[in-house]
Regions:
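Non-catalytic membrane-proximal stalk/linker segments that position and tether the catalytic domains
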Residues: 1-7, 243-482, 568
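Conserved donor NDP-sugar-binding/catalytic core segment of glycosyltransferases
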Residues: 113-141
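Short, acidic, metal-binding catalytic loop of nucleotide-sugar glycosyltransferases
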Residues: 28-38
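Acidic donor-binding loop at a coil-to-helix junction in glycosyltransferase catalytic cores
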Residues: 182-189
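Nucleotide-activated donor-binding/catalytic signature segment of Leloir-type glycosyltransferases, i.e.
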Residues: 64, 536-537, 729-750
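Short hydrophobic beta-strand element within catalytic cores of glycosyltransferases
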Residues: 784-787, 797
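Aromatic "clamp/platform" in nucleotide-sugar-dependent glycosyltransferases that forms part
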Residues: 767
Length: 865
């Protein structure tokens, strides 16, 4: 029972327009309420042109003086009428604690408001109480039961306007939108209340009777639904963004149930890096079967994962956990069940992913440490009572699908000892079959209908709202801005090293950084990637990277994927980012427009214009020009490239100059120490190093010719050739003839520092370049650079002052010029030492923090805006 107060505790607002006859039923049902508190009724005539409406209102005022109040206003629409009533109630009765909205063609049962008011008083944390919908006329009984879900409310209007709303909701500023003339203004009102921090509560047997006709205002609203929902989503934009949707999913209907065999508990979460609710097995079984019996009312995870804490920790260590869950989710939706096996045989500093789709090839050298099962398949297995194992049901899937993912980690890393996940899954299934909860799994006592999405699939709302495939379970941590770097492959080239270093600097500035590898399913060097990024992700789309000979822009080919790829799937992987940097990933151009529509800041990082076999300019600079409209910024690695982009049509305000820096930072004092050590070395053979890929671009033929000339001249030179061989893995025959040992690419900072500490000269004879990072990091420690004048090399090297530039020419001419220069340096170490010291001095403050600082400040401002 409620305490007696002086004055009405509850107000009923009845807006009316052209329902002069039905109005009588509505007001009578409000007057007949059986309550232990006082009720006042406010009729708002919204400028109805029918005289009968006005007379009916007057009749009720005279028939129930003090209880029925009448306001007549100019026509403004349903929202305006309700707001007029709200203002009148708030200004007239301080005693009113709640307001109920009753449409003039509906009615309520005698005990409705007593029950609703008591529910409101029992739950001080809620803002309103809402009913089921029981229709008459066209009969239908709608089930809106279960715990209130904001996530579901974003997809469907689950709260009828005929709800009881606490006064404080209006005091906080919630009102009906008077510009909404097409309907669903109540949906908009509830979302406003949600934004103000209020939540609803469903009340069974509320007592609302809703009149339904074949044609009505509600029917018109359904026809205009797309226009209305678009307006609502724009107005309440923060609610419909990824961060909000994902956080709501995690709280209300987490998609993953992770059973860790070492703890015996199930964690319910939508992000493997975020702790969710923890349940013991019996409690989990109860919730599982309860949701199986009443899927509209209760939630259960859509995917059950069996693993151990040690494996999840291992995945987090390599920044792979969120991506692995996303990738397994994309596979298990087709397969029903997928295994993950982890090995440590990828080679040094390397990670590699292999997906096995052949049902006959589902065995791994390592037992699976994780199994993910779709709940739908679990149900089929539990209902069948099959003794053949869950894989026998998965084999019935009609499409050829993946069964096993193998993750190979660096071979110098220890793996945790893991129990086979298959055995744990079998135990879990046996326990579920034996569980007493199964006694009520098939029984549903609900006679009402529900056309909404079942609660266990609310996680799909995020996909639909964002128009993507499965979304990566990546939560925003501590409010950090999130940026993704998109690469075709993640190796140790200049494009990749630029991305790694920009990410490192942004991470130090408080960003959360993420690496996305589109074309390759491997990456290196692991340590640098782990240091620079908070997550590592592979698109794993076999159609990426296939070039279309018929699709060109200014002579450069585009990949097939830009016009026919699985863009929604990729956008799901990228969901939740504030900014993306496309680092020469041609396929990713297709994603920039939809990302910008989601207010993601888009940046293209350009490094170099390639040359074709016929020395025709082509490549990423031209491809990016074709998509220039979709980018907010285009970052150029040199002034030369900046000027070219501007000259070819890109507005100067969109361009940013980000000069390349060294590929890795050095501890304070290290560069100076290396320079001192080199100067103090005893005279000996000139130490000349070639560091980079052994291919046409890097001038392999020029290098070979130079070595041959220096050997013929018997110059005192010690050579080191360091880099990857050609694609097929064989040693170039020219170098074989010279008997030059090729050292593998140096992937760690210590290895690179040793190389630079050893060398006097680094020789770079490229056919084309941007601004090579090797030049900057060599000069930083006093290594004298001898390089061809291509690209923007001259922006870092001043000829005869901080290095030496060789004019671009044919192979023979360049080799001859390089050999003459090396002979000069062999003979005059004073020149070598002078240039060495000048180079080190010139690079003293040339760091990524300084070269990228202005651009990153602009990027941060753009993201804030």
């Amino acid at each position: 029972m409620t305490d007696r107060i002086s004055g009405p505790a509850l107000a009923v607002i009845v807006p009316v327009y052209k329902h002069s006859v039905l109005l009588g039923e509505a007001i009578t049902s409000a007057l007949n309420q059986e309550t232990d508190f006082e009720i006042c009724i406010v009729i708002v005539n919204d400028g109805c042109p029918l005289p009968e409406t006005h007379q009916t209102c007057l009749d009720f005022v005279s028939g129930a003086p003090g209880r029925v109040h009448y306001i007549r206003r100019q026509n403004g629409g349903l929202s305006a009428a309700r707001n007029t009533g709200v203002e009148h109630v708030l200004n007239t009765w301080e005693t009113v604690r709640a307001i109920y909205f009753l449409d003039a063609d509906n009615r309520i049962l005698p005990g409705a408001l007593q029950r609703a008011y008591e529910a409101l008083e029992e739950s001080p944390e809620i803002g309103w109480v809402y009913p089921n919908i029981d229709m008459f006329g066209q009969e239908w009984n709608g089930d809106f039961s279960g715990e209130y879900s904001v996530l579901r409310h974003l997809e469907e209007n689950i709260c009828e306007a005929g709800s009881l709303v606490r006064r404080v909701v209006f005091a906080a500023g919630a009102r009906f939108d008077e510009s909404m003339k097409l309907g669903f203004e109540d949906w908009d009102f509830w979302l406003t209340a949600v934004e103000l921090g209020f939540r609803g509560r469903h009340l069974d047997n509320f007592g609302l009777r809703y009149r339904k006709r074949p044609e009505s205002m509600v029917r018109d609203s359904d026809r205009d639904r797309l226009e209305i929902t678009s307006y609502i989503q724009r107005k309440h934009k923060p609610l419909f963004e990824f961060d909000s949707l994902h956080a709501l999913e995690h709280r209300e209907a987490p998609r993953y149930g992770i059973f860790k065999s070492n703890t015996g508990c199930v964690g319910l979460t939508s992000d493997p890096n975020v702790e969710g609710r923890r349940l013991g097995l019996e409690d989990f079984f109860d919730e599982y079967y309860r949701a199986k019996s009443a899927p509209m009312r209760y939630s259960r995870p859509a995917f059950v994962i069996v693993t151990q804490t040690a494996l999840l920790d291992c995945l987090r260590q390599f920044r792979l956990s969120q991506w692995i869950f996303w990738y397994l989710e994309t596979l298990v939706e087709l397969s029903g069940v997928v295994h993950l096996a982890v090995r440590n045989d990828a080679g040094p500093h390397r990670i590699e992913v292999k997906t096995i789709c052949d049902p006959a090839d589902t065995t791994s050298r390592e037992p699976a440490g994780l199994v993910i099962v779709k709940t739908e398949l679990l149900d089929r297995y539990l209902d069948s009572g099959s003794a053949n194992g869950i894989m026998s049901l998965a084999a019935d899937m009609t499409r050829p699908t993946a069964r096993l993912v193998e993750l190979a980690l660096p071979d110098d890393r220890d793996l945790p000892s893991l129990a086979p996940a298959d055995a744990t899954l079998h135990m879990l299934l046996q326990r579920m079959q034996d569980c007493r909860s199964r006694l009520y799994q098939g029984t549903s006592w609900n006679w009402r209908e529900n056309s909404f999405r079942i609660k266990g699939e609310l996680f799909k709302i995020t996909r639909d709202m964002l128009n993507t495939g499965p979304v990566c379970p990546r939560s925003r941590q501590n409010g950090k801005r999130q940026i993704g770097f998109l690469l075709p492959l993640a190796d140790f080239g200049g494009v990749e090293k630029t991305a790694y270093n920009l990410a490192r600097v942004l991470k130090a500035r408080g960003w959360s950084t993420h690496l996305f590898v589109f074309s390759s399913q491997s990456c290196r060097p692991v340590d640098q990637i782990v240091d620079a990024f908070d997550s590592l992700n592979f698109l794993c789309d076999p159609e990426v990277g296939k070039w279309d000979p018929n699709q060109r822009f200014m002579g450069s080919h585009y990949p097939n994927w830009v016009s026919s790829g699985q863009h929604q799937r990729a956008l799901g992987l990228l969901a939740g980012l504030d900014a993306v940097v496309n680092c020469h990933c041609a396929d990713a151009h297709a994603l920039m427009a939809p990302l910008r529509r989601r207010d993601v800041t888009t940046v293209a990082s350009l490094q170099v214009t390639d040359l074709s076999a016929l020395d025709r300019p082509s490549g990423q600079t031209y491809l990016t020009l074709g998509y220039e409209y979709t980018y907010d910024h285009i970052a150029c690695c040199s002034q030369q490239l900046f000027d070219w982009c501007h000259a070819i049509g890109i507005p100067e305000g969109k361009l940013a100059l980000v000069l390349n820096g060294p590929s890795y930072p050095l501890p304070a004092g290290t560069a100076e120490a290396i320079v001192r050590t080199r100067l103090a070395r005893r005279p000996g053979p000139l130490r000349v190093m070639s560091l980079g890929r052994l291919d046409r671009q890097k001038g392999l033929d020029r290098l070979v010719a130079t070595i041959m000339l220096t050997r013929r001249a018997a110059l005192p030179i010690d050579w080191r050739v360091i880099g990857d061989t050609v694609i097929d893995g064989t040693v170039p025959p020219e170098l074989e003839q010279l008997r030059v040992e090729i050292e593998p690419a140096k992937l760690t900072q210590d290895e690179l520092t040793e190389c630079y500490g050893w060398a006097d000269v680094v020789l770079i004879l490229s056919r084309w370049e941007g601004l090579p990072l090797t030049i900057v990091e060599a000069m930083r420690v006093g290594v004298v650079v001898c390089a061809t004048t291509v690209g923007a090399v001259a922006e870092a090297v001043s000829h005869e002052e901080t290095g030496f530039l060789l004019p671009s020419a044919g192979t023979a001419a360049i080799a001859a010029a390089a050999a003459r220069l090396l002979q000069r340096l062999c003979q005059d170490r004073r020149v070598l030492n002078r240039v060495s010291l000048a180079a080190a001095h010139a690079m003293k403050d040339w760091t990524w923090e300084t070269t990228a600082g202005d651009f990153l400040a602009r990027l941060e401002q753009l993201v804030r805006e």
